[in-house]
Amino acid sequence: MSAKWEKTEENTGVLTIEVEADKVNDALDKAFKKVVKKVNVPGFRKGKVPRGLFEKQFGVESLYQDAIDILLPEAYANAVEETGIYPVDRPEIDVESIGKNEPLIVKATVTVKPEVKLGDYKGLEVEVPSTDVTDEDVEAELKKLQEQHAELVVLEEGEIANGDTAVIDFAGYVDGEAFEGGTAENYSLEIGSNSFIPGFEEQLVGLKSGEEKDVEVTFPEEYHAEELAGKPATFKVKVHDIKRKELPELDDEFAKDVNEKVETLDELKNELRSTLEEQKKTASENAVRDSLLEKAAEQAEINVPEAMIETETDRMLQEFGQRLQAQGMNLDMYFQFSGQTEEDMRNQFKEDAEKRVRVNLTLEAIAEAENVEVSEEEIEEEFQKMADMYQRSVEEIKALLAAQGGTDNVKGDLKLRKAIDVLVENSKEVTTES
C-alpha cells in the first residue's frame, strides 16, 4: 500500500491511497463468498454458484463495493498514520479505479487539524482575585445555614407574606374552560419563588387561612403550551394553611446540630472560615487559569475548521442532556417546556464551542513547543486517582475508558494540564480586590 498527501487548502487536502492488486483480489474473494450466499441461480443452491458463472451472469463489478468496504477502513487508517495527518472529520471518498488483478486507487478529501501559530504565551499578565475571607463572609454563610435549618410552622393567625409557604387548592380556567395541568389540591407554594405564572403569587399576599380568591393572570407569550400562550386566565384559589419559616437560634446547640465536629458556635465559625478560604483559593486559581487560557488562545493564530466546531457543539449538547437526565429530564422534554429547538441550542453553544476548540488547540501547541512529556508512572497514577474517586479497581477504570481512547486520552489530558502549568508558572500576577 502507498499513500500520498497533498494539501489543497489551509485545513483541507487530498489523501491518495493505492492498495496492491493481490489485496484487491483477496478482497474480491471475500466479497464473493459473502454475496453468493444471497444469490438465487436456477440449478444451484444458495452459496454454491461457481465463481466463473457468477461473474459471467452478474459481472465482477457487482463485487467491487463489498471489496472496497473490506479494504478501505484499514487502508485509510494506515494511510493516515503513514502520512502523519490528523483528520477531524469523516473523509469524502472518491474511488478512482478498482478491478480484478488491478490496484484500488482512492482519493480521500480530508479536513485536518489546523496549524497553530502561537503568540506570546509566557509573561502574560493576569489578575489574581483576593482569597481573603472577611467576618461578613462568615456571617453570610452562617445565615445560609440558619435558613437551611429553618422549620415551617403553621400560622394560627395572620396573613400571607412574601417568603411564606401557602397550602392552596387552585383551579384554572381560560375562556371559562378548565385546562390540562391547571388544577391541584393542597399544593405548597412558596410566595416569592416565582415558580408560578407572573402575577399569581403576588395576588395571594394578604390572604388568611380559609379565604378564597379569583386570581387573574395572563400566560406569557413564550409559554411552552402554545394553546395557552398569551391568553388571560382565572384561577379560583382557596387557602388552607399558611406556613412561615422559624429560624433556629444561633448558639452552641445549633452549631452541634449542623456540624458534628464542633462543640461551640465559635468553632463552627472557624470551620466555615476554613471552608470559605479553600473555596476562594480554588475559585481564584480557576479564574487565573481561565484568564490565561483565554489570553493565550486570543494571541494564537488559528483557522478553526467548521467540522471541529460542530463536533464540540455535539459534545456540549450531549453534556447538557446528561445534566438534564441527572435531574430526571431529557432534551425532548426541555425543548417542549422551554419552547427552544435543538437548532436554537446549537446556535447558542456554537460560540463557546469555538472557544473551547481554540483553547485546546493552543494548549496542544504549547505542549509541543515546550516538549511536554508524560511518563507511564504519571498515567498509572491518574488511573489510580480515578479508581479512588469512583471506588472502582484500576482494571475496571481502564476497561471503561478503553472505548474512549483509554491511555491515549489520559495521556493527552495530562499533557494539556502540564501546558496550563507552563502558562501559570510563567505569568505575571497582579493581585486585585475580590
Curated annotation (Swiss-Prot):
Q: Which GO terms describe its biological process?
A: 'de novo' cotranslational protein folding; cell division; chaperone-mediated protein folding; protein transport; protein unfolding
Q: Kind of enzyme, top EC level?
A: isomerase
Subcellular location field = Cytoplasm
This protein's GO CC annotations: cytoplasm
Pfam families on file: FKBP_C, Trigger_C, Trigger_N
The record's Gene3D superfamilies line, in alphabetical order, gives: 3.10.50.40, Trigger factor ribosome-binding domain, Trigger factor, C-terminal domain
Q: What is its EC number?
A: 5.2.1.8
SUPFAM superfamilies of this UniProt entry? FKBP-like (SSF54534), Triger factor/SurA peptide-binding domain-like (SSF109998), Trigger factor ribosome-binding domain (SSF102735)
Occurrences of domain PPIase FKBP-type (ranges): 163-248
GO MF annotations for this entry? peptidyl-prolyl cis-trans isomerase activity; protein folding chaperone; ribosome binding
| PROSITE patterns recorded | FKBP_PPIASE (PS50059)
Q: Does NAD count among this protein's keywords? A: no
Note the superkingdom of the native organism: Bacteria
Which catalytic reaction applies to this protein? [protein]-peptidylproline (omega=180) = [protein]-peptidylproline (omega=0)
Record's keyword terms, sorted: Cell cycle, Cell division, Chaperone, Cytoplasm, Isomerase, Rotamase
Annotated family: Belongs to the FKBP-type PPIase family. Tig subfamily.
Entry function: Involved in protein export. Acts as a chaperone by maintaining the newly synthesized protein in an open conformation. Functions as a peptidyl-prolyl cis-trans isomerase.
* Notes on the domains: Consists of 3 domains; the N-terminus binds the ribosome, the middle domain has PPIase activity, while the C-terminus has intrinsic chaperone activity on its own.
Tell me the protein's name. Answer: Trigger factor
